[in-house]
């Protein structure tokens, strides 16, 4: 039987909406609790150096207010390392970060930063925190992750999400080959960035991928159909992608 794929829901943009006017509404913790009820397997949040959405207080409140595993995305800096070691989330995903970017634009250059990343990864692992690296689906980067003893990688699916036709097919093959390589090296494979109802099934169908992290699309879709419905439909599509008899699955389940 094909193993169920996990869904991590990123709640950053609940905080983005809150911060547009200030105050406390909408509450990221409440969103995380609703995500759990809707079928999420974990909660992901990115504490940026400029605190443009999630704040330090949000991180504290999430620790207290949720029961799902918390995956903290962060830059590989001493400040963020100190915060991670203080809070000890279930997992930390190291990501590249530029102050001028609207969102994460690409994968971490693990191969070019081995010397600086190695002590950060080692300290996080020593604290019992699962470490992942957000990287491009590239052999050099995957082998660098292995050299850093990172137990998990998250493959950047942004280029796939922005592609069409032949380029889309090529990006999917690239992701599949990267996932197979990582699994052969005993690295757990996650994926995320730009995934939607329209493009998630081919990625979720890749058996080597254990988890997808999805945020912006789910929060945007929630404006129209509600957060729980938004997440439940994504969960449904991911399950459909992993069903051994996809036709039978679709017949037995009512599409949301």
Curated annotation (Swiss-Prot):
EC number assigned by the record: 2.6.99.2
Function: Catalyzes the complicated ring closure reaction between the two acyclic compounds 1-deoxy-D-xylulose-5-phosphate (DXP) and 3-amino-2-oxopropyl phosphate (1-amino-acetone-3-phosphate or AAP) to form pyridoxine 5'-phosphate (PNP) and inorganic phosphate.
GO cellular component, as recorded: cytosol
Binding positions for 3-amino-2-oxopropyl phosphate per the UniProt entry: 10, 21, 194, 215-216
Positions of the catalytic residues: 46, 73, 193
GO biological process: pyridoxine biosynthetic process
Catalytic reactions of this protein: 3-amino-2-oxopropyl phosphate + 1-deoxy-D-xylulose 5-phosphate = pyridoxine 5'-phosphate + phosphate + 2 H2O + H(+)
Subunit structure: Homooctamer; tetramer of dimers.
Disulfide bonds: none
Record key words, sorted: Cytoplasm, Pyridoxine biosynthesis, Transferase
Family label: Belongs to the PNP synthase family.
Organism: Zymomonas mobilis subsp. mobilis (strain ATCC 31821 / ZM4 / CP4)
Subcellular location per the Swiss-Prot or TrEMBL entry: Cytoplasm
Protein name: Pyridoxine 5'-phosphate synthase
Chief location bin: cytoplasm
PANTHER family: PYRIDOXINE 5'-PHOSPHATE SYNTHASE
GO terms, molecular function: pyridoxine 5'-phosphate synthase activity
Binding of 1-deoxy-D-xylulose 5-phosphate, residues: 12-13, 48, 53, 103
Pathway entry: Cofactor biosynthesis; pyridoxine 5'-phosphate biosynthesis; pyridoxine 5'-phosphate from D-erythrose 4-phosphate: step 5/5
Gene3D superfamilies in UniProt: Aldolase class I
